[in-house]
């Protein structure tokens, strides 16, 4: 699991998916909305380890330190194998304290099973200044999880031309005070031609690769589509 939210919403999602335990939780950085629900999750589920960027373990918030959770650091180029997924750490490129958006742990997740395959870039709260640094090493992807909840600086046309995503998704709360996703972000995606999903309107969004493409299932009104 990547990030833990700030309240019990993630607990509800885990229960709906009939999750029994978690081998690992990856925390992209130490913003409260990315780790705040972790301790409650650990009270309900067995959590094997908490994965953070190199240097971030030493700066863990006190409630994480006191929880007894096993923190494991990873660095750029490390790989994490989850079933048929191979997740490669693309950022940060140096030791960080994990406190800032630009410290966000970024993963390229790749899945292959026979003729079914897809790649997805998971960006935490990173924005275009960081994304332009690691995007050339990523190359073409199928799915872009937008940085910083789809902020105005989460994406631009030159980044989209490098990554060439078919689908982009923003995770944002309804009526959030920041106005995420930003109009600039949505407009860039529309102009590029990438299909856009947001949890505000589409609810939980799931991706299922098969030989024909990627099926996208939303718990909201859009239902299921083939990309």
Walk through the language-model features, giving the residues of each.
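Non-globular, low-confidence helical/coil segments that flank catalytic cores
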Residues: 1-227
């Amino acid at each position: 699991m990547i990030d833990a939210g700030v309240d019990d919403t993630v607990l509800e999602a885990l229960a709906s998916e009939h999750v029994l335990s978690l081998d690992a939780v990856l925390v992209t950085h130490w913003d409260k909305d990315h780790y705040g629900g972790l301790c409650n999750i650990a009270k309900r589920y067995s959590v094997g380890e908490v994965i953070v960027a190199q240097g971030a373990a030493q700066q863990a918030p006190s409630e994480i330190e006191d929880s007894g959770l096993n923190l494991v650091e990873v660095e750029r180029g490390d790989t994490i194998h989850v079933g048929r997924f191979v997740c490669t750490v693309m950022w940060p490129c140096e030791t960080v304290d994990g406190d800032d958006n630009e410290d966000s742990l970024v993963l390229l997740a790749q899945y292959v099973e026979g003729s079914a395959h897809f790649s997805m870039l998971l960006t935490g709260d990173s924005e275009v200044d960081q994304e332009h640094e690691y995007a050339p090493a990523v190359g073409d992807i199928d799915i872009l999880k937008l940085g910083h909840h789809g902020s105005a600086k989460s994406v631009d046309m030159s980044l989209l031309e490098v990554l060439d995503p078919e689908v982009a998704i923003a995770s944002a709360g309804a009526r959030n005070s920041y106005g995420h996703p930003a109009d600039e972000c949505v407009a860039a995606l529309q102009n590029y031609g990438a299909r856009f999903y947001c949890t505000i309107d589409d609810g939980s969004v799931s991706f299922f690769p098969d030989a024909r493409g990627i099926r996208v299932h939303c718990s909201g009104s859009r239902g299921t589509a083939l990309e």
